[in-house]
Amino acid sequence: ADDANQMIYDILSQDRVKRIIKTKSSTIEEIGLIPYLEMKKIKVTETNIGDFICQLYNQVPYNIVHSADNKTNSQIADLYSDKFGIKQNCNPKQLTLYTKQLLKEEMSNPSAVITGANFLVSNSGTIVLTENEGNILKSCSFAPIHIVVASINKLITSIDELSVLLPLSSFYEPNRNISSLYTFINGPVEIEGQLQKLYLILLNNNITEILEKEIQRDILSC
């Protein structure tokens, strides 16, 4: 984790990046990247709505999928009134639209984006990202620097395996059989005439050590 954080900071430093956007990723949370970058004076903005609300509260996500489910509409309305000066009697739809507009501005001109990855296809070099809000696709499309942080257990052999794994990855998300959007990345894109800088950081974080243990290896099936 420490090596990954240092590597990411070095990448951002060589381009003098001081402001980045981030998408939802449990791996990024695992290595403590955001507090590390903020300690280095790099501003990080969450682009997932729930994670953005948690960031405003200066709290970690309540749930891996629904980050701010522990907050009521009135609590969020009070928060937005304090932070942005909007009226306190906003309904959930108004709050969502206001948040989307804030994040749209952040995603339209980022210096860099950091994402996780749902799957890494080894035989084609494809990075697969799943989402429901559209923030990942927007972020990756505009950022001149894209850093992907993924653990080695995201590696799969063939893209054919996704026919099973993509529906399965949404199995535990309430009221949704499959994710709304998929992004398949096979290399850097061209942004305003320049080729995007794309980095993939593979994280071991003791996974290979756990795999060697007959009983403990089962936790990696979660």
PLM region spans:
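The feature marks the mature, well-folded catalytic cores of soluble enzymes
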Residues: 1-219
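Short cysteine clusters
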Residues: 222
